[in-house]
């Protein structure tokens, strides 16, 4: 069973007994040099070997060799050997396949490396080409710069050459002019010497010629005077001796003087008549009365005004219920007065600014079918001496109205002040007297309406001429809400829905917002609320998208409130009473 241990013996040779194993020595060898017995010596490599397994294997081999199944065991061993060889061959194939796969991976890696190398070479070539292109561009730019510098240098040299040539030409011209001037001076000097010499030589002849010319001129003048005197004398003698000519001449001159004087006065009278009938006085700022010039300029508007029907006196005017009832009674009474051709009553409207006095006066005139004219008291004082004439022209012009005229005097306290206590000029005093003279009696031609913020400054004679006094107070919360809604509809809603203007309105509760604004604007007048609505419209137009938002309205309301407070502070600083407190005191 040598094959069991991997040892090949000769053919037909048996296997002897197993080789004896060397005995195990538990201890060391004898003593040696250096006292070897004192320390342990090196152990043998077979000292820890257990031979039991080998003995069992040898025993099994002997039994197998003497057994009758030795051949089958040998065949089995050979088959196992073949199986091992096949397994080794399979492993070899796997190894070869692994080697081939490794070669394939190496080839793929080499291809990838080659691709990367080519890509890197391409990138390097591109970078080299870009760098070469950059160098070429820089070289081209340098060439252009050099060429530009060369051109500039050539241009500079050409300019210098032209300047030198111009300087040389200028010097040549100056030299030529200098020589010409010298020659001219020499010529003039020579001519002067020659002329002086000739005059010295011909002095007697020249004096004789001058004497003869003077005598001839004197003789001519004397003869002309003598001839003219003779002609005038004979003509006057003939005119005086003929009495018919004298009479006709005197009559003609008299008629000429009368004609010139008559034409001058007739022109003045006609001008005053035309001014009173057709023109507009200088004190009148605004009027609804139609003039010839206005009819020629705006015929369509004039025709619409003539065909328009009387309007409601309180249309567009927001007042408190009590005041509204009172002014409506005044409007009805005025309209009936015009229908019955009776005498008009004079009205005084007083109160803070912006409460609707002027607006109601216009509406009252339109409701009554009358014309209106507006003048301001501040225009009277600057006229000086012409104030009396201008005041008479206003009342003369008002008396010529066929429909009746409502004369509205705004800021009347500016010239209708107290004559006893106020310091007014003589011209203004005379104008006030003329006003009192023309308003001393009621008229069926015009109705006088005065408006003032300080009625206590009126002259007592003015108060005596007032038939009705109406106090316009600041709007309360209900009136303010009506005003806010009216002006919001006029300046915001209508332009946003009807017009073609660039105005849009954001979505929010308009009614609630108007109520909130009316609550916040306490103490404001109707004019201030109107200005607030106009400011909303302006903010919408000023925005980029043209949309009026709730925040924009709130911001403008806060600005208006702050401005109103500032105005009230200024009024208190001046020592005047604010309109709200003044109204409450009254």
UniProtKB/Swiss-Prot annotation:
Keyword Signal: no
InterPro entries membership: AAA+_ATPase (IPR003593), ATAD3_N (IPR021911), ATPase_AAA_core (IPR003959), P-loop_NTPase (IPR027417)
Subcellular localization: Mitochondrion inner membrane; Mitochondrion matrix, Mitochondrion nucleoid
Keywords from the UniProt entry: Acetylation, ATP-binding, Coiled coil, Membrane, Mitochondrion, Mitochondrion inner membrane, Mitochondrion nucleoid, Nucleotide-binding, Transmembrane, Transmembrane helix
Transmembrane annotation, as ranges: 246-262
Topology of this chain in the membrane: Single-pass membrane protein
Single Gene Ontology MF annotation: protein serine/threonine kinase inhibitor activity
Coiled-coil portions: 55-218
N6-acetyllysine sites (modified residues): 490, 494, 512
Expression triggers: Up-regulated by Angiotensin/AGT.
Residue numbers bearing the N-acetylserine modification: 2
Compositionally biased residues, Gly residues: 27-38
Binding residues for ATP: 351-358
Annotated positions of the N6-succinyllysine modification: 490
Region S100B-binding, annotated ranges: 289-304
Family of this protein: Belongs to the AAA ATPase family.
Oligomeric and partner information: Can form homooligomers. Homodimer formation at the N-terminus may be regulated by ATP and is required for the interaction with the inner surface of the mitochondrial outer membrane and correct mitochondrial homeostasis. Interacts with components of the mitochondrial ribosome and with other proteins involved in mitochondrial RNA metabolism. May also interact with protein involved in lipid metabolism, including STARD9. May interact with FAM210A. Interacts with GADD45GIP1.
Known role: Essential for mitochondrial network organization, mitochondrial metabolism and cell growth at organism and cellular level. May play an important role in mitochondrial protein synthesis. May also participate in mitochondrial DNA replication. May bind to mitochondrial DNA D-loops and contribute to nucleoid stability. Required for enhanced channeling of cholesterol for hormone-dependent steroidogenesis. Involved in mitochondrial-mediated antiviral innate immunity.
Domain writeup: The transmembrane domain and a C-terminal adjacent region contain all information necessary for mitochondrial targeting.
Identification of the protein by name: ATPase family AAA domain-containing protein 3
Organism: Bos taurus
């Amino acid at each position: 069973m040598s094959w069991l241990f991997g040892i090949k013996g000769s053919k037909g040779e048996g296997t002897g007994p197993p080789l004896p194993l060397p005995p195990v020595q538990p201890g060391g060898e004898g003593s040696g040099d250096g006292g070897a017995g004192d320390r342990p010596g090196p152990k043998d490599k077979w000292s820890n070997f257990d031979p039991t397994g080998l003995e069992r294997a040898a025993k099994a081999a002997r039994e197998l060799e003497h057994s009758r199944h030795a051949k089958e065991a040998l065949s089995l061993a050979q088959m196992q050997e073949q199986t091992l060889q096949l397994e080794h061959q399979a492993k070899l194939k796997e190894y070869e396949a692994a080697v081939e796969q490794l070669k394939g991976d190496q080839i793929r890696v080499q291809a990838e490396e080659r691709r990367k190398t080519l890509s890197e070479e391409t990138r390097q070539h591109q970078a080299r080409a870009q760098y070469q292109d950059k160098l070429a561009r820089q070289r081209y730019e340098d060439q252009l710069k050099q060429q530009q510098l060369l051109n500039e240098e050539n241009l500079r040299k050409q300019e210098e050459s032209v300047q030198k040539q111009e300087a040389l030409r200028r010097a040549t011209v100056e030299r030529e002019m200098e020589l010409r001037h010298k020659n001219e001076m020499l010529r003039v000097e020579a001519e002067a010497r020659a002329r002086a010499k000739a005059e010295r030589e011909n002095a007697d002849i020249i004096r004789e010629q001058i004497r003869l010319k003077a005598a001839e001129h004197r003789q001519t003048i004397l003869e002309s005077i003598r001839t003219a005197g003779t002609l005038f004398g004979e003509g006057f003698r003939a005119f005086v001796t003929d009495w018919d000519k004298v009479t006709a001449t005197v009559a003609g001159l008299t008629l000429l003087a009368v004609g010139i004087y008559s034409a001058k006065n007739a022109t003045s009278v006609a001008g005053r008549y035309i001014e009173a009938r057709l023109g507009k006085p200088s004190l009148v700022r605004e009027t609804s009365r139609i003039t010839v010039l206005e009819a020629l300029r705006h015929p369509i508007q004039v025709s619409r005004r003539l065909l328009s029907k009387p309007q409601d006196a309180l249309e567009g005017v927001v007042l408190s219920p009590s005041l509204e009832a009172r002014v409506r009674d005044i409007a009805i009474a005025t309209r009936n007065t015009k229908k019955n051709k009776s005498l008009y009553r004079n009205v005084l409207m007083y109160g803070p600014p912006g409460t609707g006095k002027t607006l109601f006066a216009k509406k009252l005139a339109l409701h009554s079918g009358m014309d209106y004219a507006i003048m301001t008291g501040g225009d009277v004082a600057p006229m000086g001496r012409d104030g009396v004439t201008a005041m008479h022209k206003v009342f003369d012009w008002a008396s010529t109205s066929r429909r009746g005229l409502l004369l509205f005097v705004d800021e009347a306290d500016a010239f209708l002040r107290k004559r006893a206590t106020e310091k007014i000029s003589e011209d203004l005093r005379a104008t006030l007297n003329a006003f009192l003279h023309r308003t001393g009696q009621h008229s069926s031609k015009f109705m006088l309406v005065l408006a003032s913020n300080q009625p206590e400054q009126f002259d007592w004679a003015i108060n005596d001429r007032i038939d009705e006094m109406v106090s316009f107070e600041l709007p309360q919360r209900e009136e303010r809400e009506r005003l806010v809604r009216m002006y919001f509809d006029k300046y915001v809603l209508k332009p946003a829905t009807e017009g073609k203007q660039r105005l849009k309105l954001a979505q929010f509760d308009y009614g609630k917002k108007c109520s909130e604004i009316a609550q916040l604007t306490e103490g404001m007048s109707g004019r201030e609320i109107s200005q607030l609505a106009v400011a909303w419209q302006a903010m919408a137009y000023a925005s980029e998208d043209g949309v009026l938002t709730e925040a924009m309205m709130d911001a403008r309301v806060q600005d208006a409130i702050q401005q109103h407070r500032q105005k009230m502070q200024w009024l208190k600083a001046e020592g005047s009473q604010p309109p709200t407190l003044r109204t409450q005191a009254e």
